[in-house]
Amino acid sequence: MTENSELNNKISTIKLKKLIEIQNLTDNMNGTVIRIRGFIESITSCSSQIFILLRDRLEKVQCIIFKSTNVSSIYEFSRLKKLPLESFIEIEGQVVFAEIPIKRATKQNIEIVISTLNILGPVVSKLPFQLKDCKIAGKESDTNTITVGYNLRLDNRFLDFRLPVTQSIIKIIDQTMYTFRTYLRTHEFIEIKTSKIIQSGSEGGANLFSLNYFNKPAYLAQSPQLYKQLAIIGGLKRVYEIGHVYRAEVSNINRYLSEFVGLDIEMEMETTYIDFIHFLHSLFINIFESFKNEMKKELEIIRQYYEFVDLKYRSTPIIITYKDAVDMLKSKNIQIDYGCDFSREHERILGKIIKDKEDIDIFTIIDYPSSIRAFYSYIDETTKLTRSYDFIVRGEEILSGAQRENRYDYLKNAVIDKGLNPENLKNYLEAFKYGAPPHIGCGIGLERFLKAYFGFDDIRYFSLFPRDPNRIFP
């Protein structure tokens, strides 16, 4: 029999009281006997007492074992002092007022006097790293503080999930998807799920993951673009998707993921593309406000690890044209020709220009030339520019979209002009022969959006199990 098994047998059996989560403990529960569970974050002791800081989700409460109680014998008391950190335990005890506020706990005014204790999940091996040693790169701190490398944290992601900052980021991710979904459902959008195994790419280019599909070549979808459009042509009017997207980008791993979550929107075009930009801006305002109103605790925890600056925005969008943006860059002596796409550095400089001028961190660039947009972008017959738009947050593109070309002949010619083979897009093109409504849409990279929102330098913080050219596990 193992030492932990012996300890479990000797410690009193827990009665089946209703389990209470630490987050639901309140000051007015003084004197109540409760049952709670959590991970042991720390243990300190003196000759007659053991103090256990118990953690569950984002909450922490101090629990006390008195040597004089019947929790354990003298021998067992000494062993309880040595319980491994991160052991998952269940305790029963009485809630009492703390004489002095317990600063290291989130429940600072109460503590639990333990009467029974059970080790539900023992730690049987040395931890890969100590959670107290983790911090996000960029946080100013004592240079003597040990920092756990992020790759080590990712290798042991299950343990990294226990960090309050990681859980806070995960809750922010969840809140983003929830608000995105709620906003669109309120506006009568239908959620769809498109295939991720495709016959050919929607964007052209070589950034595709190939696979063997029953002895036939296939690829992982780099966008749900074509399927979204087919849904609109099919009369669904307004659709959205939250789903994985795959890009075989061999580039800066801090900015790109090989697998990321796309937030995609497509709808019949009812007014103008400028009106759709206002609709999207309102969506982002809803997300930003939901962070401020519903994620206060999570934002504060993240600040303890990374001191980000609050995003500045207005209720109405700031919109500049592609030409305006190029002129702004030229005014700063940046070498760029009209017709060139913006680099990451160009976006960063434009973000600074707009911030200095408007004191705003989010703006929209519209009317790109067709040479740097996808084949399905609608070209205005007067301006000869696409009715397109990119949203920039803190100098980083987080959304790209356009009105779509819905006329078959124009669309087929655009495919050819881009050097693509119409045969590879035959099923897609065929749909436009049978009455395709004018439509419009966009795609948002969830992880990149949140990276830009917080101003972090590594996109991997916003993916549960990030995939990049150097990582395919866990």
Curated annotation (Swiss-Prot):
Keyword set, alphabetical order: Aminoacyl-tRNA synthetase, ATP-binding, Cytoplasm, Ligase, Nucleotide-binding, Protein biosynthesis
Any one Pfam family match given in the protein's UniProt record, by short name: tRNA-synt_2
InterPro entries from the UniProt entry: Aa-tRNA-synt_II (IPR004364), aa-tRNA-synth_II (IPR006195), aa-tRNA-synth_II/BPL/LPL (IPR045864), Asp-tRNA_synthase_2 (IPR004523), Asp/Asn-tRNA-synth_IIb (IPR002312), NA-bd_OB-fold (IPR012340)
EC number: 6.1.1.12
GO biological process: aspartyl-tRNA aminoacylation
GO cellular component: aminoacyl-tRNA synthetase multienzyme complex; cytosol
Annotated localization: Cytoplasm
Molecular functions (GO terms): aspartate-tRNA ligase activity; ATP binding; RNA binding
Segments of this protein annotated with the region Aspartate: 225-228
Binding residues for ATP: 247-249, 255-257, 397, 445-448
Domain of life: Eukaryota
Chief place where the protein resides: cytoplasm
Residues reported to bind L-aspartate: 203, 247, 400, 404
Quaternary structure (record): Homodimer.
Protein family per UniProt: Belongs to the class-II aminoacyl-tRNA synthetase family. Type 2 subfamily.
PANTHER family recorded: ASPARTATE--TRNA LIGASE, CYTOPLASMIC, ASPARTYL-TRNA SYNTHETASE
Name under which the protein is recorded: Probable aspartate--tRNA ligase, cytoplasmic
